[in-house]
A protein has these predicted regions:
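Coupling/switch segment of ABC-type P-loop NTPase heads
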Residues: 169-269, 425-433, 437-452
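Acidic, Mg2+-coordinating catalytic modules of nucleic-acid enzymes
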Residues: 1-69, 102-107, 131, 184, ...
Length: 497
């Protein structure tokens, strides 16, 4: 046991003379506990870390969390399980020079323009949780100093150990991020839906060594769109085979969960998506599952991109949970109750009616797996309909909204912003998140903005009034609410439409 660090923890709140040093702490430990030479030799490591003197004593005492960041973990300590992402700090990587992200317990929504780092943030979140990159590893910014690039994260479970933060410094010589060997908290089950149609899955029970805490290379499985459909040997059977297997199994438990999840994620105002009888199609020896529509059954491989993405998400969530239960049963331990779901561009391929319903449905999926499952959901979106959809579900105690924005000086900012109920989707479009001046076409927006400028002028010319009226007629429909204001203004100037 390191005597120095034990003394730091035990005496962290004490007051010390100005000339105190590291040996002062260790000597106090020896005196207070009356340690003899034999006890010191057999029970303690009496060495003092190098470079500690300059930061050991300060005016204000450190918090327990700050001290835990410094303390090395006990060599025989076992990691806590069932963690979720509590904090992610990025320095000198990605579009922002520095970024601090504190995901909420239940739902976190990330918005922002293209190219500002939403996908990059999810990739770093996945890496922090699993220790593996789902795609290309993040690289330092071109303007980064040698000591700058680092990723700092905190995965929380229960207890003090889960409050520890982990810092990974970029290795310039190896051009890589060092692998983390062991961590105080292991995350729960994770499913990551990437925007290119691929998926990544992490299961701590299947892919960790409980004794050594070393993460196996296959700890995080990343499946291409084709592998999710057709399988990968020794890892996943694939949607086609698993769906058919579940559907024809004497035990319908898994298939019922799958059907329930699909139905909850179905597009609104239509008949729920329902699995139908599998069929054979030319050139394929397999039984292909189908989905029942009002107009008939459709083989899954012929479905629309939107239906394929949502049904595939449902499949991966159910598959990951089912495999987790199998692994827990084989290991004779209780299954995890924490699931982390990452979804990039939640609205991809979905009709506006479906965009307005999909996120509330995602919030309900965990309970369909098991009423005791607790989910942390982190999504990115460009859609005002997705934000409007959770106005009645958003809880500031358990949910958060973050926004990436390009500032006037050309830097990317990342801030948490209050979630406001704006009601109309038009109001969301013209909010600070989406930054449209008008919820119209670009030509209509420009015409209305110019008309507003003329409204503020004292004596606009008749030619200007007729010119802008023509632009408004070209870009606005007759029932547009702006016409009432403009017609009244023209009448005051002696012009009738």
């Amino acid at each position: 046991m390191p005597a120095f660090w034990l003394a730091v923890w035990l005496f962290r709140s004490g007051r010390w003379p100005n000339k105190s040093g590291a040996d002062t702490l260790v000597n106090k430990l020896i005196r207070d506990f009356a340690l003899n030479e034999k006890e010191k030799q057999q029970l303690f490591d009496m060495t003092i870390p190098k470079g500690i003197e300059g930061v050991l004593f300060q005016q204000n005492p450190c918090s327990d969390e700050e001290i835990l960041d410094l303390l090395p973990p006990a060599p025989d300590s076992k990691p806590q399980r069932g963690g979720a992402l509590r904090q992610l700090e990025l320095e000198a990587i990605g579009p922002t020079k520095s970024l601090t992200f504190n995901p909420a317990d239940r739902l976190t929504i990330v918005t922002g323009d293209n190219g500002l780092g939403k996908t990059f943030l999810l990739e770093c979140a996945w890496w922090s949780l699993t220790g593996n990159w789902a795609g290309r590893p993040a690289t330092p910014r071109l303007d980064a100093d040698k000591t700058e690039p680092k990723i700092k994260f905190q995965i929380t479970g229960k207890g003090l150990a889960s409050q520890r933060k982990t810092t990974i410094q970029y290795n310039w010589e190896k051009q890589a991020w060092p692998l983390l060997k062991g961590r105080p908290t292991i995350p729960g089950l994770i499913v990551y839906a990437r925007v290119d149609g691929s998926f990544a899955v992490w299961d701590p029970l299947r892919y960790t060594f409980p004794q050594s805490q070393l993460l196996r290379p296959e700890a995080a499985l990343v499946f291409s769109r084709e592998e999710v459909l057709d399988g990968r040997p020794e890892h996943i059977e694939g949607l086609i085979r698993d769906w058919t297997k579940w559907q024809h199994s004497p035990d319908q438990t898994v298939f019922e969960k799958f059907k329930n999840v699909i139905q909850r994620l179905s597009p609104p105002e239509e008949a729920p998506l329902m699995p139908s009888a599998s069929v054979r199609i030319p050139g394929d020896p397999r039984e292909i599952p189908t989905i029942r529509h009002i107009y008939g059954d459709v083989p899954f491989i012929n479905e629309s991109a939107g239906i394929r993405r949502i049904v595939t998400l449902a499949y991966l969530i159910v598959w990951a949970w089912t495999e987790h239960l199998v692994s827990a049963a084989l290991a004779k331990i209780a299954p995890e109750r924490k699931i982390v779901v990452l979804i990039d561009e939640m609205e991809a391929h979905l009709h506006p009616k479906w965009q307005r319903d999909i996120l509330p449905a995602i919030l309900d999926v965990a309970a369909l797996l098991d009423p005791l499952v607790d989910a942390q959901i982190i999504i990115t979106t460009h859609s005002p309909l997705v934000l409007a959809s959770v106005e009645t579900r958003f809880d500031s105690e358990s949910d958060s909204l973050y926004h990436l924005n390009l500032t006037k000086n050309g830097e990317v900012s990342f801030v948490e912003i209050p979630f406001l109920r704006l009601g109309s989707v038009d109001d969301w479009l013209t909010s600070d998140i989406f930054e449209l001046k008008q919820a119209r076409s670009r030509e209509g927006e420009q015409a209305v903005e110019r008309a507003k400028q003329i409204l503020a002028e004292e004596a606009p010319s008749k030619e200007e009034l007729m010119e802008i009226t023509g632009r408004l007629q070209m870009s606005l429909p007759p029932e547009d609410i702006f016409w009432t204001r403009w017609a009244y203004f023209l009448e005051r100037k002696g012009i009738r439409l």
